[in-house]
Swiss-Prot record:
Highest taxon of the lineage: Eukaryota
Bias (Low complexity) ranges: 130-149, 510-520, 754-770
Polar residues bias locations: 164-175, 773-783
PANTHER family: RHO GUANINE NUCLEOTIDE EXCHANGE FACTOR 33 (PTHR46944:SF1)
Modified sites of kind Omega-N-methylarginine: 766
Species lineage: Eukaryota, Metazoa, Chordata, Craniata, Vertebrata
Entry keyword Electron transport: no
Gene encoding the protein: Arhgef33
Organism: Mus musculus
Protein name: Rho guanine nucleotide exchange factor 33
Residue stretches making up the DH domain: 273-448
Length: 850
């Protein structure tokens, strides 16, 4: 019993201790589980971050691989396209080679067949000669008789097919070129505006065509069955090799090969001619840049020789000259880059479109040069005459003349390029637009071109006559003293003192682009002495009438054709020392007492400038030739004579050739250039008026002289200006290359009210605004038209302060607030009427109403 009680007590005691230990154990296990779970969660988080990083890497690698695969696909596709194009080109070339090979084989067979025919005929003739007798037997190498169609053929047994084929090309090229040259001669436009009578074919082209001429003769002699007998030869070949089943098909195939070969040869010939014309244009531009660079050298010589020269003498050269030189230099570089790297379809029209564009201002500066040129010529005449250097004067006149003719030369060259350009060519439309722009420009400024050329020609002729007179005087004195104690070198010294050299005694001008100008002061002294000695030996002393007749021999006849346009490259050095080439001069040089109503100009019929661009010239235009050039001019030019030639006859003998008597005569018209843009190098003053604008002061003076029955005498400087019948002029910038509308038509000219009746009537008649093509002027306006052109340019002789004072409008000037005395009042007496009016009525002068 005690034992059972003890066991029960132990059992009762045990449950008391077990729960606490169990709880403790459970807590320990729970903490272990918690730490393990935390570590597991941390590990899981690290694993998840690693997976995210790997996923990003996989995505980036996938994108890069996709891009690379896409690039590879694109490159593969591009390579496939290029490969297909190359294969197609190879196939086309292969087919062409097969055609050419067939043609060569055909030609070789024909050659062999004809050689057999020739040998058979020779054998027959030898047999016939042997039968007739040994006397009639021909030599072994003799040609057949006249009846044989192959009398000029001496064909060997066999020949290379390549020789046959290449020998045919020069023949066809030259025959086509010969046709184009005949078109050149027949088309009077191509005789052109570049220098009087200058042929568009150049010495280079002539020299290049000489070998082709010999090749043509040989090809005609030795290859008579050439290109022009291909249909017949094709028929013979077909008859020889055709089968009985399909004869027509083989004949058609042979004729198709003939036509395809002819087309290929014609295309190559046209491209070669176009490249030749482009090379001529490049050579012309190169020589022209050399010429105008000589003007800058002369200008630097003048300015550097005397640093104290006044500003008026420094304006011997137009202010726009340096800008024009830069433009032509840029054009030369562009042409060299294009022409020397000439592709199959070379383009030149974009260069001239850029040159003649409104934003480029090249044509504006060219017009400025044409307007400044009369002033510069007068200054050259005065300043250089004072210094006594006639060599430089002759060179300056020659170089000035080259620049005047450059725009017409461009028209000639572009027409030649356009003539050998197909309508499908990318340059065809560009050249057509350039030709149209140049025609419009030349037609608008025809009078400026004509007046400058006439003035330069007359100055050159006067210089030549004065130089000849000095030469004859020197020769006469040398011959008179020859018997006494004159040294052998006296004649050379006399010739040198006279300022005349051999090239100055020949012709008034060289051709504008035929060669570099004959700058006499650049010649070697030894060569000058040889030429002068030969002149002295060729001339003997005689009467003055004989000298005059001898001098006329050197003048150029009007109908003489000028030499070719360009010289070869090896002749450039000789051209500097060669004589001056000639240009056709005007048909008249009237004396001061000759009435201008009798003056006539030579006219030519209207030629075909360009068959593809006839529509650009107005229908009412005729072709007028001045200086050997042909330009469109309004028809009334030769139909309107002077109505009052007495105004030009009684000229003041006391007036000098200085600029003092012509610089007061022109009032300024400011509205003409109101919309003209300003340029940094703009040489034109704001007061530059158009050839059609009126000179109010001079017309008023002429009207008053007519009202009082007296003719106002003109100064000698006005007599030097070329007297030509009046033409319908236009405003200086009436045209626009962007549109043909009169968008730049000048505003209405403001004028001060005239106190006299005739002056008011004249001002009222001139006050109406002008249209794009002005109306025909009245007879009173035609009388003083050419004088106005000269006086307009001569106003630039005034000092700079006077020209600046002219920049205000007439309506803003107070006519009575001008200064009295000084430079202005000293010449006030020149404008008073000569009717003995003691009050001395004032009238409109260049500075307003006095």
């Amino acid at each position: 019993m005690e034992k059972s009680k003890a066991k029960q007590g132990e059992n009762e005691h045990m449950p008391v201790n077990n729960p606490s230990t169990q709880i403790y154990q459970l807590q320990a296990l729970a903490s272990e589980l918690k730490t393990g779970f935390t570590e597991a969660m941390q590990e899981l988080t690290r694993i998840q971050h690693g997976e995210y990083a790997l996923e990003e890497k996989v995505k980036s690698c996938r994108c890069s691989m996709e891009e690379k695969v896409t690039e590879m696909k694109n490159s593969l596709n591009y390579f496939k396209e290029e490969l297909s194009n190359a294969m197609s080109m190879i196939q086309a070339i292969t087919s062409k080679q097969e055609e050419m090979q067939q043609k060569i084989e055909q030609l070789q067979q024909e050659k062999r067949r004809e050689s057999r025919k020739v040998k058979a005929k020779k054998a027959q003739k030898e047999e016939h000669g042997a039968q007739a007798g040994p006397a009639s037997a021909p030599a072994p190498g003799s040609a057949p008789t006249q009846g044989s169609p192959f009398r000029s053929i001496n064909v060997p047994e066999a020949g290379l097919p390549s020789d046959d084929f290449t020998n045919m090309l020069p023949s066809q090229n030259y025959e086509k070129a010969q046709e184009s040259r005949s078109v050149h001669v027949g088309d009077s436009n191509v005789k052109g505006m570049m220098g009087p009578g200058v042929n568009p074919t150049t010495p280079e082209s002539d020299e290049n065509l000489k070998p082709s001429l010999s090749a043509e003769i040989q090809s005609k002699g030795h290859h008579t069955p050439g290109l022009w007998r291909q249909p017949k030869e094709g028929k013979e070949w077909g008859e020889e090799y055709v089968t009985k089943d399909h004869p027509d098909k083989l004949k058609d195939a042979g004729q198709g090969r003939h036509s395809s070969l002819e087309n290929v040869l014609c295309e190559t010939s046209l491209a070669a001619k176009r490249q030749t014309v482009a090379l001529e244009l490049l050579e012309s531009e190169r020589k022209y840049v050399i010429n105008i660079s000589l003007i800058l050298k002369i200008k630097a010589t003048f300015q550097g020789s005397d640093g104290k020269r006044n500003p008026k003498e420094r304006s011997l050269f137009p202010g726009s000259l340096r800008y024009l030189v830069q433009q032509h230099l840029d054009l030369l570089h562009a042409l060299q880059e294009r022409v020397l790297k000439w592709p199959r379809q070379g383009v030149l029209g974009d260069l001239f479109l850029k040159l003649t564009n409104d934003e480029n201002n090249f044509l504006d500066y060219y017009v400025a040069y044409l307007r400044d040129l009369p002033e510069c010529i007068s200054l050259v005449h005065v300043v250089v005459l004072k210094e006594g250097d006639e060599e430089i004067k002759s060179d300056i006149y020659t170089l000035f003349f080259h620049i005047v003719q450059r725009i017409p030369e461009y028209l000639i060259h572009l027409q030649n390029v356009l003539k050998f350009t197909e309508q499908e060519h990318p340059d065809y439309y560009l050249l057509l637009v350039c030709v149209q722009r140049l025609r419009v420009f030349i037609s608008h400024y025809t009078l400026l071109f004509q007046c400058n050329e006439d003035l330069l020609i007359q100055k050159r002729k006067k210089l030549k006559k004065s130089s000849m007179a000095k030469l004859y005087k020197g020769l006469a004195s040398q011959c008179a003293n020859a018997g006494q104690d004159a040294s052998p070198n006296a004649g050379q010294e006399a010739v040198h003192d006279s300022g005349v050299h051999s090239e100055e005694m020949l012709q008034p001008y060289p051709s504008s682009s035929s060669s570099a100008p004959a700058v006499s002061h650049l010649m070697a002294p030894a060569k000058k002495g040889q030429q002068q000695q030969s002149l002295m030996e060729s001339m003997q002393p005689g009467k003055p009438g004989d000298w005059e007749l001898e001098g006329r021999k050197h003048e150029r006849p009007e109908s003489l054709l000028a030499p070719a346009q360009f010289c070869a490259a090896e002749q450039d050095v000789k051209a500097l020392a060669g004589p001056l080439q000639a240009i056709p001069e005007m048909d008249f040089e009237p004396s001061s007492a000759e009435p201008l109503g009798n003056v006539e100009r030579s006219l030519r019929g209207p030629p075909e400038l360009l068959p593809d661009a006839r529509g650009f010239v107005p229908a009412g235009y005729e072709e007028f030739e001045y200086g050997g050039e042909i330009f469109a001019l309004p028809a009334p030019y030769d139909e309107e004579p002077f109505q009052a030639p007495a105004l030009f006859d009684n000229c003041s003998p006391a007036s000098s050739e200085s600029s003092l008597d012509i610089c007061f005569l022109r009032p300024v018209s400011f509205a003409m250039e109101a919309e003209r843009p300003e340029h940094a190098l703009q040489p034109l003053p704001k007061s530059a008026t158009s050839p059609a604008s009126s000179s109010g002061a001079y017309k008023l003076e002429a009207a008053q002289a007519q009202a009082h029955g007296k003719a106002k005498p003109l100064s000698r400087s006005l007599k030097e200006f070329p007297r030509t019948p009046p033409a319908e002029g236009v405003a200086p910038r009436l045209y626009s290359t962007r549109s043909s509308s009169g968008g730049r038509a000048p505003l209405k000219v403001e004028r001060a009210p005239a106190p006299h009746g005739p002056a008011a009537a004249a001002a009222a008649s001139r006050g109406a605004p002008r249209t794009f093509f002005p109306q025909q002027r009245s007879q009173s306006e035609k009388q003083t038209y050419l004088e106005e052109m000269h006086l307009e340019d001569a106003t630039r002789f005034c000092p700079k302060e006077e020209r600046e004072s002219e920049q205000t409008s007439f309506s803003d000037q107070n006519p009575r607030q001008d200064q009295k005395g000084g430079f202005r009042s000293s010449f006030r007496k020149l404008f008073k009427k000569k009717n003995g009016n003691s009050t001395g009525e004032d009238f409109c002068g260049p500075w307003g109403w006095w």
